[in-house]
């Protein structure tokens, strides 16, 4: 892997150039070689005026069996961490960011993208959730809202919208539904709520003693803690997750009617 870098001799600091243009991509005997040409901005502007011994040059680095996909995944993971921490999913819901991002797609065409804003109308129907699952393992899936009734006053934290256990090999449809899916129903004038999807890998098939909750009532949904649930069943930390935000729209009164509110 040949990468051209800008290296600035400033108290052992290294500045990577802002732009890289892919020029060549060849693969020979499992050795991937790429060549990049840097688009340079005068580097001296980044140094303090007190720096007198300024020196800049380019250097090349060759790395065999370099995984570009892993590099991209690390960069994406950093963005994911930033989103979950920026929006306080950590620590309001979980104590650490899951390593994997779950893919969540709604029948409306909406997708969940690490804190993007969707509408209750877009998320009213049960989504498809996928992750890198072991075919021989069982999983638990949860969707929960830590902002009930609002982020400012979350006295009902958490209000869980969906809970499925004993999911075989990532096939949610074959899992044991503990709480049927209910879409987002943030009250008016309460701002954006966070809706967090989390997947836990079970040690094996479990016996859950939770009351089964239908989707035509909001009873027993509030005051839930996914962290406490995970501790109760020794689920450990979530292996995958994602979240979106939503606020009140015209669908919410329809949902409330469905719930008998």
Predicted segments — roles?
Residues 2-7, 18, 31-261:
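N-terminus-centered regions that define maturation/targeting leaders and the start
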């Amino acid at each position: 892997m040949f990468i051209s870098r800008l290296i600035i001799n400033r108290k052992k600091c290294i500045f990577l150039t802002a732009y890289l243009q892919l020029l060549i991509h060849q693969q020979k005997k499992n050795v991937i070689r790429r060549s990049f040409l840097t688009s340079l901005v005068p580097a001296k502007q980044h140094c303090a005026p007190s720096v007198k011994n300024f020196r800049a040059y380019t250097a090349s680095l060759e790395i065999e069996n370099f995984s570009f996909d892993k590099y991209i995944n690390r960069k994406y993971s950093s963005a994911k961490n930033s989103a979950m921490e920026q929006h306080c999913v950590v620590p309001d819901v979980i104590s650490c960011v899951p390593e994997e991002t779950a893919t969540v797609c709604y029948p409306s065409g909406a997708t969940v993208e690490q804190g993007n804003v969707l509408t209750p109308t877009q998320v009213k129907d049960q989504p498809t959730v996928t992750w890198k699952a072991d075919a021989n393992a069982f999983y638990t899936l949860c969707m929960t809202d830590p902002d009930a009734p609002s982020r400012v006053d979350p006295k009902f934290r958490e209000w869980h919208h969906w809970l499925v256990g004993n999911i075989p090999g990532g096939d949610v449809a074959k899992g044991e539904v503990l709480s049927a899916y209910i879409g987002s129903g943030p009250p008016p004038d309460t701002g954006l709520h966070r809706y967090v999807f989390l997947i836990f890998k079970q040690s094996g098939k479990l016996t859950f003693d939770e009351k089964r909750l239908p989707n035509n009532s909001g009873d027993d949904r509030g005051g839930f803690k996914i962290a406490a649930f995970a501790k109760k069943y020794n689920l450990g930390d979530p292996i995958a997750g994602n979240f979106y935000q939503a606020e009140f729209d015209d669908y919410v009164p329809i949902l409330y009617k469905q719930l008998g509110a």
